[in-house]
């Protein structure tokens, strides 16, 4: 009897050891996220648009550059390029971006402070300078996303019925000029209709309320503006007939895209529209000044906040063959919390790629002070200030 008890004890010990080992391996594989692994690749439709977005791989924003506004002290409009970041763009910068492994450059551009008449004609000097940088990127086989950026105001672009006619006039004028200039460019150039269209100054400027009448109206207006944009580009000739186009929802937020009122435009060609989303998530870590400076893949809530919105975008769009580009993401530097930012960036990119989405880091060349310090590339030395963050993202691109 004792011998049997001894054997039974040995067997039980073995079972416990195997069970613990298996549990540990499962925890390792899910990286602190429970039974389901959020980093496991999901089923991705293989239509042309989805494959195109996969080829974009990972992007970098030339932020706080051509999007700069509100500086009346400048004597030369071209000085706007360095008004917010202190540097003019150089080919050496673009070389550094390319060599680091980025495959896409998003070039945010504000146009309203470069107009020459009441018909919204953009100055030739500004057009030429933006075009020069676009060419630098494309000549290096980089994809470029070009948009209308900080033009969100009642004078130019505002999503309400009161200002809809004015907004459509502005969108039409700007995109008519851009469509004509770039109509012979190939698919390396992507047009993005608007940047974060929203009710500027409203209590729901950044946080959409699906029950608020103003928000409901704004969503409908954004749908109209996106449709005007798509129709205009498609009818402008050349390669614009098949160009990939990005369309945002309210404030370009994931909530805006997921809102049941948001509708992608109808198009004359299949699989050429991309949903544009910005997601500094989780907000309290990535963007909020007073928030936390810690993020860890061992923290279940950190993981849930990130993959939660990605799963919803996947379910609504990706499963139906509609691609999504997260045109802005990142985590601001909070007291040199680079270890947390590196872990965050790696996980974010891997989780997005697992769902068929491409991400673009928001780099505003800001490194010091208590502001929104999203800078990665030192634009003077053309060296990466935080190479570990860049390398972490590149690990999960292919």
How would you label these PLM feature ranges?
Residues 165-300, 311-331, 354-357:
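Active-site region of glycoside hydrolase catalytic domains
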Residues 29-104, 316:
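N-terminal carbohydrate-binding accessory modules
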Residues 1-11:
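Bacterial N-terminal signal peptides that target proteins for export
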Residues 336-398:
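Aromatic-rich peripheral "rim/lid" segments of glycoside hydrolase catalytic domains that contact
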Residues 63-89, 117-122, 163, 284-306:
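Acidic/histidine-rich helix-loop elements
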Residues 85-104, 119-148, 157-193, 222-234:
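An active-site-proximal structural segment forming one wall of the substrate-binding cleft
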């Amino acid at each position: 009897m004792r011998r049997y008890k001894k054997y039974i004890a040995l067997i039980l010990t073995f079972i416990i050891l195997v069970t613990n080992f298996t549990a540990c391996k499962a925890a390792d594989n899910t990286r602190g996220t429970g039974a389901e692994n959020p980093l496991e690749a999901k089923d991705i439709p293989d239509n042309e648009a989805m494959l195109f977005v996969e080829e974009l791989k990972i992007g970098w924003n030339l932020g706080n550059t051509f999007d700069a506004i509100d500086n009346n002290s400048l004597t030369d409009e071209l000085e706007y390029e360095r008004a917010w970041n202190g540097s003019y763009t150089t080919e050496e910068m673009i070389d550094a971006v390319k060599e680091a492994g980025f495959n896409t450059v998003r070039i945010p551009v504000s146009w309203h402070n470069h107009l020459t008449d009441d018909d919204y004609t953009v100055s030739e000097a500004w057009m030429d300078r933006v075009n020069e940088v676009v060419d630098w990127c494309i000549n290096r086989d980089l994809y470029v996303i070009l948009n209308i950026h900080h033009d969100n105001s009642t004078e130019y672009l505002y999503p309400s019925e009161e200002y809809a006619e004015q907004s459509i006039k502005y969108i039409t004028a700007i995109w008519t000029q851009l469509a004509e200039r770039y109509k012979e460019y190939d698919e390396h150039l992507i047009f993005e209709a608007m940047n974060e269209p929203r009710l500027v100054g409203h209590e729901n400027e950044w946080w959409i309320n699906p029950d608020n009448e103003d928000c409901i109206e704004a969503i409908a207006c954004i749908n109209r503006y996106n449709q005007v944009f798509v129709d205009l580009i498609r009818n402008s000739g050349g390669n614009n007939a098949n160009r990939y186009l990005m369309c945002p929802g309210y404030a370009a937020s994931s909530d805006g895209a997921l809102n049941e009122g948001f509708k992608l435009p109808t198009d004359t060609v299949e699989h050429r529209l991309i949903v544009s989303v910005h997601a500094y998530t989780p907000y309290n870590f990535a963007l909020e000044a007073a928030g936390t400076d810690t993020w860890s893949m061992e923290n279940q809530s950190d993981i849930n906040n990130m993959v939660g919105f990605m799963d919803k975008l996947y379910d609504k769009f990706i499963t139906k063959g509609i691609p999504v580009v997260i045109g802005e993401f990142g985590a601001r530097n909070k007291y040199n919390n680079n270890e947390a930012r590196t872990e965050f960036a790696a996980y974010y990119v891997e989780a997005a790629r697992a769902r068929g989405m491409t991400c673009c880091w928001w780099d505003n060349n800001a490194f010091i002070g208590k502001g929104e310090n999203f800078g990665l590339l030192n634009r003077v030395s053309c060296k990466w200030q935080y190479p570990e963050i860049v390398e972490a993202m590149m690990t999960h691109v292919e």
